[in-house]
């Protein structure tokens, strides 16, 4: 909303127009007990349908959420590299590229298909399901669902390995600066990047460990979620390899909204990793540390029990962009080359084992 205020200056009435900043999607909304993650590919010829449907997302959220506001329904729509130039003319996000597949000495982070990501969450699954259904119906005949995960809160925000997940999330101004693009890409200020991976856990191997051994894998105590002291924390502990700093030693953060999921009949126990960041380079350095090792070969011990089966990188534009997007590209317009070819080019980012 634009606020127009009448003031009197030097005897003259002047209208001062306050134009609000762009509205980001609800990246920083608190965790909820329920979530649905939808990954879609856009079929050939489906671009116009998807382009139109994306403009209706915020209206669908309002319409469904208004019926039961106490359930705090929200949704974040994100777009992948391969489909961006099929959907929008004009500028392209500076760091948008395909997910960087990693092949380490023992473990692999695969890249899997995905053009659109919908992160839908609420206090209960019913409104998530209703919104997901409406979104898919609005894109019927234009998209294919390639992955669908229904996540749930597990006790006090624990994963199915039994540890609290998301403790190190920033909050307040630090959360904003960790996720919102600024002057470095002014065409997309207020937007952010998001990585997703679906991990499946080997619960038989995990439960065979003692609690102390499990704590050494994670780097935290299991019951009360306290980080282990540096002198006892193993170098290959999960949290030790996820500390990323810049050249000045300042720790760089991402915002995780991970959710457990599972299917008992298939003995499937998993964690859906979803990490929002101002630049994809921070999350990519974390993944390099985990899968390739820091130093090389010192890989994340958690990967001996958790296998990544999907991987995607998407761009989460502002609400303003989605409500009024650039037009579709003209027929025959060649796709603009990505600003980066998928190489990590970390530059000033580095991992710090602690």
Swiss-Prot record:
Pfam assignment, any one: Dyp_perox_N
Name of the protein described by the UniProt record: Dye-decolorizing peroxidase
Function: Cargo protein of a type 1 encapsulin nanocompartment. A heme-dependent peroxidase. This cargo-loaded encapsulin nanocompartment is probably involved in protection against oxidative damage.
Active site, per annotation: 165
Subcellular location: Encapsulin nanocompartment; Cell membrane
Species lineage: Bacteria, Bacillati, Actinomycetota, Actinomycetes, Mycobacteriales
Listed GO CC annotations: cytosol; encapsulin nanocompartment; plasma membrane
Species in which this protein is naturally found: Mycolicibacterium paratuberculosis (strain ATCC BAA-968 / K-10) (Mycobacterium paratuberculosis)
Entries under PANTHER family matching the protein: DEFERROCHELATASE/PEROXIDASE, DYP-TYPE PEROXIDASE FAMILY PROTEIN
One GO MF term: peroxidase activity
Free-text comment on this protein's domains from its UniProt entry: The C-terminus (residues 312-335) targets the protein to the type 1 encapsulin nanocompartment.
């Amino acid at each position: 909303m634009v606020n127009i205020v009448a003031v009197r200056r030097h005897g003259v009435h002047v209208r001062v127009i306050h134009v609000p900043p762009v509205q980001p999607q609800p990246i920083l909304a608190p965790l909820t007990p329920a979530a649905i993650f939808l990954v879609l590919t856009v079929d050939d010829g489906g671009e116009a349908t998807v382009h139109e449907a994306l403009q209706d997302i915020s209206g669908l959220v309002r319409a469904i959420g208004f019926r039961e506001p106490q359930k705090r329904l929200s949704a974040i729509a994100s777009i992948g590299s391969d489909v961006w130039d099929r959907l929008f003319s004009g500028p392209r996000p500076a760091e948008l590229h395909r997910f960087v597949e990693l092949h380490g000495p023992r473990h692999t982070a695969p890249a899997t298909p995905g053009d659109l990501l919908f992160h839908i969450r609420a206090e209960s699954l019913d409104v998530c399901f209703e919104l997901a259904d409406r979104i898919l119906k609005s894109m019927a005949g234009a998209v294919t669902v390639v992955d669908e995960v229904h996540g749930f809160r597990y006790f006090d925000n624990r994963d199915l390995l039994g540890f609290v997940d998301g403790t190190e999330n920033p909050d307040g101004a630090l959360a904003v600066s960790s996720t919102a693009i600024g002057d470095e890409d002014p065409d997309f200020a207020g937007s952010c990047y998001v990585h997703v991976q679906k991990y499946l856990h080997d619960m038989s191997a995990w439960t065979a460990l003692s609690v102390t051994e499990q704590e050494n894998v994670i780097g935290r105590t299991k019951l009360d979620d306290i980080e282990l002291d540096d002198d006892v924390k193993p170098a290959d502990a999960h949290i030790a390899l996820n500390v990323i700093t810049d050249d000045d030693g300042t720790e760089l953060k991402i915002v995780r909204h991970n959710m457990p999921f599972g299917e008992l009949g298939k003995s499937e126990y998993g964690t859906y990793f979803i990490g929002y960041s101002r630049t994809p380079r921070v999350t990519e350095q974390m993944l390099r540390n985990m899968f390739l090792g820091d130093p090389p070969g010192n890989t994340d011990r958690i990967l001996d029990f958790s296998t990544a089966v999907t991987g995607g990188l998407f761009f989460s534009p502002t609400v303003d962009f989605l409500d009024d997007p650039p037009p579709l590209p003209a027929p025959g317009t060649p796709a603009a080359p990505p600003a980066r070819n998928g190489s990590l080019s970390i530059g000033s980012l580095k991992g710090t084992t602690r």
